[in-house]
A protein has these predicted regions:
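C-terminal motif of bacterial Sec signal peptides marking the signal peptidase cleavage site
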Residues: 14-17
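Acidic, metal/ion-coordinating pockets
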Residues: 19-306, 312, 346-358, 368, ...
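Catalytic centers of hydrolytic enzymes
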Residues: 23-29, 38-47, 51, 55-66, ...
Length: 582
């Protein structure tokens, strides 16, 4: 055999080896997390409680790796990692010198790909750009194929990655939520836009399949499962499942509702949130003539045991945990009255008085909008530590002061209360919009609000009533400004609200007739994140005094009427929402 013949033979061998996996049977385990929301550590930092965490997820993942072999396991996160817990906040904004803890954890845990979520974008460019660089340096792509640069039309983040396991080529594509522009200020996602997942995901899948010739295709989207009727931009999971071709697994997220939907050709997995479950998909391949001849798919959810953690991982990140704990437990002031969010559902409350007081102090605000941000949050009076500020205000929302007419303010409040209450003519009805239905998280029936309580905005700076016997449009009667000045529907006012709300979050601005796509034209001033305002307030005032935060000359007064209907009906509904232990 001459050299040319030998070279040709070698080339043929090389090409044959690249043509596809060897004939035989293969099985891969796809493990997924999503909406981790900063639950990196298993401690609540105070009180000695144990919570579900990435520490416990690691133990769960390793048990599968031990059973089937590390090379047969693929680990993917579907986004919303960098917001929601003290640890994320600390490494996002407080200690920006130490390498961010999440990329280090993702490397330690062996993640193959991470998807960008809307709350990751909410942290701002400095944070997510840094995290993206760190992840990429560890060989972990930060995926968001629908985040398109304004300057050149190319993706801002990575679109996909290819894994090669035992000769099998596995493509993972990732996409962020398409609705981000309706929630977040453009300042947080400057330089890019977020495309609709339909038809973009299919287009990108087709490109990747044509270029990379993968044997397995996984799509990870930071989008809720949804209803599949095409009506919700933030919930496109089932819309995708109905239309995608050439995809084996669709990983969904965002809504915090754990669910799996198996089928012979495409499995949907949504692991819920906060490390409660690990999504688990299995794909078994039969390869004949170096091509995939058949596939079998299955999916399930694996419950995570919060008490069973990886002790080696705990040791590895112990110094990081101590740094977060020290930050979390430092004293910041005194609270002179209990703060609870549940009281906000029935009228004015100390909790919302505080939010309104700080918001309306953002000059030149005359009015403020605010809602209870947790369903049943509570902080007991006494010494405050920084951890309490996360309970009072769990999100990284900035405060915007926005121009609105008096009529827009009234229409906004009418829209808010229409989500909150029913029209009733006697105490026998449900004054609160609640229903007895299955809880997606527990599987048990319980009473809950039909709408999201964090969209139940009330107003500070006004004196008004809300008549529960009247329909939407005539419930809200604004008597005056807090200081007694007349309120004029034709006049323009400066209104303080969160960046989330101003950008269209919750849809209330739209229902008031305001185009949030042009909100920059209405913004007259911006302020830092609300938690920073609260921290600075405590530095200046030392304590939170109910007499100060409840000053009617500053925040006004509002109430539901008529009392003879409201009082007994509210008591009945609140007992259903928050039953007393017997």
């Amino acid at each position: 055999m001459n050299i040319k013949t030998l070279a040709a033979a070698l080339c043929c061998c090389i090409l044959a080896s690249c043509a596809g996996p060897k004939n035989g049977a293969y099985s891969f385990q796809i493990l997924t997390t999503n909406d981790v929301h900063g639950t990196f550590f298993d401690s609540t930092y105070v009180g000695g409680n144990v919570k579900k965490s990435l520490m416990a997820v690691k133990r769960t993942v390793d048990s599968v790796r031990t059973a089937v072999g590390k090379e047969n396991v693929i680990l993917i996160d579907a986004g919303d990692i960098l917001q929601g817990d003290n640890a994320a906040y600390y490494f996002n904004y407080v200690d920006t010198v130490t390498p961010h803890v999440y990329p280090r954890m993702a490397k330690y845990m062996g993640y193959d790909a991470v998807t960008v979520g809307n709350h990751d974008i909410e942290t701002g460019h400095k944070v997510y750009d840094r995290v993206a660089r760190d992840l990429e340096s560890y060989g972990i792509p930060f995926l968001a194929g629908n985040a398109i640069r304004n300057d050149n039309g190319k993706p801002y983040f990575s679109v996909y990655t290819i894994l090669k396991r035992q000769g099998v080529r596995i493509a993972i594509l990732g996409f962020d939520n398409a609705n981000i522009s309706n929630w977040l200020s453009e300042r947080l996602w400057s330089g890019m836009k977020f495309e609709n997942l339909l038809p973009l995901v299919q287009q990108d899948v087709d490109k990747v399949v044509a270029k990379e010739k993968p044997d397995v295709v996984i799509v990870s989207v930071h989008s809720a499962t949804g209803s599949g009727d095409g009506s919700q931009l933030e919930s496109q999971g089932l819309d995708l499942m109905k239309t995608l071709r050439g995809v084996d697994f669709l990983i969904c997220s965002h809504d915090h509702k754990p669910v799996v939907i198996p089928s012979d050709t495409l499995c949907l997995i949504n692991a819920g949130s906060h490390c409660r479950y690990v999504g688990h998909g299995v794909i078994s391949l039969t390869v004949e003539k170096r091509k995939v001849a058949s596939k079998e798919l299955s999916c399930e959810l694996i419950p995570v045991d919060r008490y069973k953690i990886d002790p080696e991982m705990e040791k590895e990140f112990h110094d990081d945990y101590l740094a977060v704990k020290d930050f979390t437990t430092r004293e910041v002031g005194e609270l002179m009255v209990d703060l609870g969010t549940r009281e906000a559902y029935t009228g004015m409350s100390h909790y919302l008085n505080l939010i309104h007081t700080l918001s309306i102090s953002c000059s030149p605000a005359q009015v403020s909008f605010a809602a209870p941000l947790t369903f049943n949050g509570f902080v007991r009076k006494g010494k405050l530590i920084y951890n309490d500020l996360f309970t009072i205000y769990p999100f990284e929302n900035q405060i915007y002061v926005v121009r609105m007419t008096g009529q827009e303010i009234k229409d906004y409040l009418e829209a808010s209360y229409d989500r909150w209450i029913n029209t009733v003519d006697s105490p026998a009805g449900h004054v609160l919009k609640i229903a007895d239905r299955d809880d997606a998280r527990t599987g048990q029936k319980s009473w809950s609000f039909i709408e999201r309580a964090y969209n139940f905005d009330s107003a500070g700076g006004l004196v008004y009533t809300v008549d529960v016997t009247k329909p939407r449009g005539s419930r809200v009667d604004i008597k005056s400004m807090a200081g007694g000045q007349p309120f004029d529907t034709g006049k323009e006012y400066k209104v303080a609200m969160t960046s989330y709300r101003a950008s269209g979050g919750g849809g209330l601005m739209k229902e008031a007739g305001i185009d949030t796509g042009k909100i920059e034209e209405r913004i007259v001033e911006t302020y830092p994140e609300f938690r920073d305002l609260l921290y600075n307030y405590l530095k200046d005032n030392v304590s939170i005094d109910p007499a100060v935060i409840g000053d009617p000359v500053r925040i006004g007064h509002w109430e539901f009427i008529p009392e003879e209907i409201v009082k007994p009906a509210m008591e009945k509904d609140m007992e259903l929402l928050f039953p007393r232990r017997r």
